[in-house]
């Protein structure tokens, strides 16, 4: 809710004053009647507001498992960094497939060098 978000932003300012250099914006489940807008990249607008009002770099992991959503969140300024959690657990080669989907040249080099060399040479 708005009051809790305002309190969180104030807390983020205090963390920054204490030396914090990156804040992970997440959602808590301590409010039983919270209306959480589940969906792809749903934490983006909240993280962007925290970033802007607390003037601190932010990351989030909620709903950014699709490579294009993650890229857009950074390009648009919603996030400074996307934390990929569940997608990496489901596929340890997520970074490779994300790089391919986003058209990264030499996408195999998101993997360790011995694997990248093999993939680039034999695929």
Model-derived segments and spans:
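Flavin-dependent oxidoreductase catalytic cores
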Residues: 1-123
